[in-house]
Regions:
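A short loop-to-beta-strand structural motif that recurs across blades of beta-propeller domains
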Residues: 75-77, 120-122, 163-166, 214-217, ...
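Conserved beta-propeller blade signature
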Residues: 64-67, 108-111, 150-151, 197-200, ...
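Short glycine/acidic-enriched loop and turn motifs that connect beta-strands
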Residues: 70-73, 114-117, 156-160, 204-208, ...
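N-terminal secretory signal peptides
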Residues: 1-6, 15-24, 32
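A short beta-strand motif characteristic of beta-propeller blades
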Residues: 41-47, 85-91, 128-133, 174-179, ...
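Beta-strand-rich domains and repeat architectures in extracellular enzymes and scaffolds
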Residues: 45-74
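Repeated scaffold domains used in trafficking and secretory/extracellular systems
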Residues: 51-56, 95-102, 136-144, 184-191, ...
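Blade-level signature of beta-propeller repeat domains, shared across WD40, Kelch, NHL, RCC1
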Residues: 639-665
């Protein structure tokens, strides 16, 4: 995607380079920026990351209907394959992910997430119609039976019965059909024939602790009878990822696993005709069929696979977008068409094997600011993470450039030489970007597949190591990772806070790494603290706490460890003597910051000052009393908690709404 110069930024910065340098120019020394005479100086820098991230695609005739992800309002666009242009845009009044998508009779059916108490099922036939609501659900998948009945499933947090299969019809509205897996954390796939509806469940989020693994259920539509038809080879996998009816004689089922599996069933009696592993693949997502040829895509590696139904042969047909996470696959004659989450459409000519790709924004998709994932800054560059990309803001030039990154850059850190390191979800590991050398971010090291969700990445100034805290969505727990930049060899310490706690917070100081724990499940231990020698790879101490909540962020300033809990409580630990045998950490001062802090706040130690950020506000903490002084109200829109960065001149960067701002405190 070419450099863009947002009009919003032009309005805010005027002449671009001159304005940026005059407002954000470096002070004489690399120290925290001096406060303005009348409080903080705040400069708007335009949308943090403006793009068209996506999460679904369904082909109707010659148009690929593509659902957005993390945009407000949520929307669906029509991409016309013959011309390579976006020809329609439909905005939805509710929702965040447009994840469920299915066609029937030339009509598009949709399901969305994040629509509490409002419609999360829609139909579009040239006019958008709200159909109703699956109660309490983030809708993950929808399917339409031959008679027009719409089926849906999703994630219903806290529901004792587990994820349900729901049906919508004009006569009955939305009704519950079955809830056969109370210990699964979400429903992920549905399909329907004239006689049966199918539900695929599992626990790829908030797993562990006895959560159900992959389960496939057939529901007889006439009687409501439920039968577990999970193929044996799939039972050990994490979740059923896709169920697709491919004619009267074939039902294709895929999983997320290590590796992923595909099973082919006879819809008449649900016999398993064939099942096989897909090597090197975490998730298989979308199917298409013509005669004895089956095509399918994978999420993490961008591979388009071909399977011969007659011989059983399996081969990699193409990699249309390297490392592109696939969210849709269609066929128009001799052309396969798919999409990847960073806003790319690809086509493959089955006759010639030629692959073409198209950026959706260049094709006319309405780019908009997406929810932020991460932020980092140095040397006049600010990076804002999103879905499938980083936005690189060049402050001097006044430009923004899209850097493709598969998945989500959950946290980022810039080294003194300007090299950016990223912890990337899901199961993407550690990535690197060297400005002026790397044309795009590159993967430098893999992590174990189950250690899929980096929460934090920090640099230890004493050892030069990168320190990561990671969450394992599928098994529970997490890991503490140390990594020497450039080595390609991370050291992974699994479950350093026990098998149930993820490592949400990491801080470095005094030659130690300090870890803070949380728990993705509603019950179980959380809030533990630990200290590690990152070079020796050994625990120095560990303690449970009475914080009553998970630890969201940690920072070291002087001889004090400062922390914030996920519900906005500040605390301190005196680190004097923390490396001596017999040291017993004690929670010292405490303060309730609920008045200024939202969920999952973060800390940043900068020079002698301590700053905090939440979706509600940017604030300064008094080192002695923990009293908070609000610097800027934010009402920020992040995907998983606010982030805060500082450059070498002491200028702070975060989001206000979805706009990137620079703050000279």
């Amino acid at each position: 995607m070419p450099d863009v110069n947002p009009s919003r930024r032009q309005l805010l910065l005027g002449t671009g380079a001159v304005a940026a340098l005059s407002v954000l120019g470096p002070p004489a020394a690399a120290a925290p920026a001096a406060p303005g005479a009348h409080g903080p100086e705040v400069t708007g820098l335009g949308p943090g990351n403006s793009d068209f991230p996506l999460m679904s695609a369904t082909l109707i005739d010659d148009t690929l209907w593509i659902g957005s992800r993390n945009l407000a309002p949520a929307r669906v666009i029509g991409y016309h394959l013959p011309t390579g242009r976006v020809t329609a845009t439909v905005e939805l009044p509710t929702g965040n992910f447009v994840q469920g998508s299915a066609a029937h009779g030339g009509v598009l059916h949709l399901g969305v997430t994040d629509a509490p108490g409002a419609a999360n099922l829609y139909r579009y036939d040239g006019t958008l119609t709200a159909l109703g609501s699956v109660p309490g659900a983030d809708v993950r998948d929808v399917a339409v039976a031959p008679d027009g009945t719409l089926y849906a499933t999703g994630r219903q947090k806290g529901r004792a019965a587990g994820p349900g299969l729901y049906a919508w019809s004009p006569a009955g509205g939305v009704t519950e059909v079955a809830s056969p897996a109370p210990n699964a954390t979400q429903g992920r796939a549905v399909a329907a024939t004239a006689t049966h509806a199918y539900l695929g469940v599992g626990s790829n989020l908030a797993g562990g602790g006895g959560a159900t693994r992959a389960g496939l259920y057939a529901v007889e539509r006439a009687t409501g009878a439920v039968t577990d038809i999970t193929p044996p080879d799939l039972r050990g996998d994490t979740i059923i990822r896709r169920i697709t009816v491919l004619g009267d004689d074939l039902l294709a089922v895929s999983t997320e696993g290590a590796p992923a599996h595909v099973a082919l069933l006879d819809p008449a009696d649900h016999r398993v005709l064939r099942s096989f592993a897909v090597p090197g693949t975490k998730s298989v997502t979308n199917f298409q069929r013509r005669g004895d040829t089956l095509w399918f895509t994978s999420t993490e590696h961008g591979v388009l696979w071909r399977h011969d139904l007659a011989t059983g042969a399996l081969d990699q047909l193409a990699v249309p977008v390297p490392d592109g996470n696939s969210w849709g696959l269609g066929r128009l004659g001799d052309t396969l068409a798919g999409v990847t989450e960073g806003g790319t459409v690809w086509t493959l000519d089955l006759g010639t094997g030629a692959v073409a790709t198209r950026d959706l924004v260049e094709a006319g998709a309405p780019a908009a600011a997406q929810l932020g994932m991460s932020v980092a800054a140095r040397a006049g560059r600010v990076y804002v993470g999103g879905n499938g990309s980083l936005a690189l803001h060049d402050l001097a030039a006044g430009t923004v450039r899209k850097l493709p990154v598969p998945g989500e850059a959950k946290d980022t850190v810039v080294l003194d030489d300007g090299t950016l390191y990223l912890g990337v979800y899901s199961s993407q590991g550690i990535w690197r970007y060297r400005p002026g050398t790397d044309p795009a971010p590159v993967k430098e090291a893999a992590l174990p597949q189950e250690q899929n969700r980096p929460q934090v990445i920090r640099r230890d100034p004493d050892s030069g190591l990168l320190l990561l805290g990671v969450q394992a969505d599928t098994t529970g727990g997490g890991s503490f990772v140390t990594y020497r930049p450039g080595s390609g060899r991370p050291t992974v310490h699994t479950d350093p806070l026990g098998p149930e706690q993820l490592v949400r917070a990491v801080a470095a100081g005094h030659g130690q790494a300090f870890l803070g724990g949380d728990n993705a499940r509603p019950t179980g231990p959380r809030g533990d603290l630990a200290a590690w020698d990152p070079v020796a790879g050994r625990e120095l101490w560990r303690t449970a706490t009475d914080l009553g909540a998970g630890v969201s962020s940690l920072a070291v300033l002087g001889n004090t460890l400062y922390g914030l809990t996920v519900n906005g409580r500040a605390f301190t630990v005196d680190l004097c003597g923390s490396r001596r045998p017999g040291y017993a950490p004690v929670i010292g001062r405490r303060a309730d910051l609920g008045a200024v802090s939202g969920a999952n706040p973060r800390l940043l130690a900068l020079g002698g000052a301590l700053y905090g950020v939440s979706e509600r506000s940017l604030f300064r903490l008094d080192r002695d009393t923990l009293a908070a002084t609000v610097l800027v109200g934010l009402d920020a829109e992040w995907y998983s908690g606010a982030r805060l960065a500082a450059d070498e001149h002491g200028v702070l960067y975060t989001l206000r709404g979805r706009e990137l701002i620079a703050v000279r405190p």
